[in-house]
């Protein structure tokens, strides 16, 4: 009985609660970073140095009355944000930090499949609101997400050929001699840009173009449901950066100090997340056709070429992983 309780309740909770806390403070870091980049302080009133701001934001959002447009679809209106957050939390299950909640043989495929399902929550919310702005925003988001998933999938395939397995733990073993960032740096660059687009972040945040779309597919959401979307979006950002750290920034343990494994991975993921914020502060939004041109005309041919190249390399080098 205790075993079942541990596996099905305590373990998932011990995973979900820290992720949600990290998401809350990622919003604070974002506001602080953007503030300092614009030569201002950012949140500094609630608590010391504004540290309690995320808690105040969360309380404020969840005690607001959830207003629902009278013409919207009641079930879909609530189901979409719940689905978004559920998927965002489930995606963390196979992440090796250093031990995953569910040790899957095909962890990478699981992440790829579930991140594709997130499209349905966006589409559902855009359609349920019965508003033309929300629908256009949702269609943009869906087109963008599924386009960039093509390049993400091909990049993953190339990297999997290097590591020789679909489990995320094998990447730690592969990269004990050298980070995959070094032999596969063009893939790492394309992967990072694709994760920016996949998570709808600036400069790819076309779904939230205030000037033309009044904030996109979550335009009519307020209070609790909006907070769920918000949490899901930032959880996905953290997940993508943790995944980037596992895939390209290698073995999360230093052989001499194995105790630092988790801190090591967290530091890499946090630095990558701060780069997300840096990009947001630096670049203006793309035009929609440029966004699509980038993935279909630039990334797709390049990633296909790299898949061929990475297939040829292990055959030529007797299946050895990259080494110094």
Swiss-Prot record:
InterPro entries linked to this entry: NADH_UbQ_OxRdtase_su1/FPO, NADH_UbQ_OxRdtase_su1_CS
Annotated EC: 7.1.1.2
Taxonomic superkingdom: Eukaryota
Compartments where found: Mitochondrion inner membrane
Keywords of the record: Electron transport, Membrane, Mitochondrion, Mitochondrion inner membrane, NAD, Respiratory chain, Translocase, Transmembrane, Transmembrane helix, Transport, Ubiquinone
Membrane topology of the entry: Multi-pass membrane protein
Main location class: mitochondrion
TM stretches of this protein: 9-29, 75-95, 106-126, 146-166, 177-197, 228-248, 259-279, 299-319
Reactions this protein catalyses: a ubiquinone + NADH + 5 H(+)(in) = a ubiquinol + NAD(+) + 4 H(+)(out)
GO biological-process terms attached to the record: aerobic respiration
One GO MF term: NADH dehydrogenase (ubiquinone) activity
Keyword Electron transport: yes
Keyword Lipid biosynthesis: no
Gene Ontology terms: cellular component: mitochondrial inner membrane
Function: Core subunit of the mitochondrial membrane respiratory chain NADH dehydrogenase (Complex I) that is believed to belong to the minimal assembly required for catalysis. Complex I functions in the transfer of electrons from NADH to the respiratory chain. The immediate electron acceptor for the enzyme is believed to be ubiquinone.
Family: Belongs to the complex I subunit 1 family.
Name of protein: NADH-ubiquinone oxidoreductase chain 1
Natural source organism: Cyprinus carpio (Common carp)
Lineage per the UniProt record: Eukaryota, Metazoa, Chordata, Craniata, Vertebrata
This protein's encoding gene: MT-ND1
């Amino acid at each position: 009985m205790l075993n079942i309780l541990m596996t099905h309740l305590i373990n998932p909770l011990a995973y979900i609660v820290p992720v949600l806390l990290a998401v809350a403070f990622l919003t604070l870091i974002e506001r602080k970073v953007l503030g300092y980049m614009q030569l201002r302080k950012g949140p500094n009133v609630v608590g010391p140095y504004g540290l309690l701001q995320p808690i105040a934001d969360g309380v404020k959002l969840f005690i607001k009355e959830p207003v629902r447009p009278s013409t919207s679809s009641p079930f879909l209106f609530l189901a979409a944000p719940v689905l978004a957050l559920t998927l965002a939390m489930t995606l963390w299950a196979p992440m090796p930090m250093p031990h995953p909640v569910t040790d899957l043989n095909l962890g990478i495929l699981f992440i790829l499949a579930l991140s594709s399902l997130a499209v349905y929550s966006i589409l559902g919310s855009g359609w349920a609101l019965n508003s033309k702005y929300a629908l256009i925003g949702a269609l943009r988001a869906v087109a963008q997400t599924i386009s960039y998933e093509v390049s993400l999938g091909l990049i993953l395939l190339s990297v999997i050929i290097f590591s020789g397995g679909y489990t995320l733990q094998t990447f730690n073993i592969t990269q004990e001699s050298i980070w995959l960032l070094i032999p596969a740096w063009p893939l790492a660059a394309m992967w990072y840009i694709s994760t920016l687009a996949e998570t709808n972040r600036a400069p790819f945040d076309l779904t939230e173009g205030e000037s033309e779309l009044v904030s996109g597919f979550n335009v009519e959401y307020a209070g609790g449901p909006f907070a769920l979307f918000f949490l899901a979006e930032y959880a996905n950002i953290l997940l993508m950066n943790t995944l980037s750290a596992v895939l390209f920034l290698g073995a999360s343990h230093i052989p001499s100090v194995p105790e630092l494994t988790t801190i090591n991975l967290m530091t890499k993921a946090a630095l990558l997340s701060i780069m997300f914020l840096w990009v947001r502060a630096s670049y203006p939004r793309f035009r929609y056709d440029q966004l699509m041109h980038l993935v279909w005309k630039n990334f797709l041919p390049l990633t296909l070429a790299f898949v061929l190249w990475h297939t040829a390399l292990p055959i030529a080098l007797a299946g050895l992983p990259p080494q110094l």
